[in-house]
Amino acid sequence: MMITLFIDASAYPSPRDLHASLKRMLSLPDYYGMNADALYECLSERREPVHLWIYSSGEGDTARSLSTVCAVIRELGGTVRTIGPERSEPV
């Protein structure tokens, strides 16, 4: 089984808002630390990979945070694709 998420990071004014949304969408535990290290820890405890579709990677700190989230997802065997106007994967 694979978990599929669709994200428009331009809707999140801060990295914390992005992580709060990930916490909700992925049903992460209350102790989730709202950062990439905590995301790695929580997702590595699961068996199902995450498939992330990105409409927009956002700007500034949110874009940098999303880039780190993408790296975590890829490292754990998931995939990341861009479907919006940017049409390129985050760095």
Predicted regions span which residues?
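Positively charged, polar, low-complexity stretches
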Residues: M1-V91
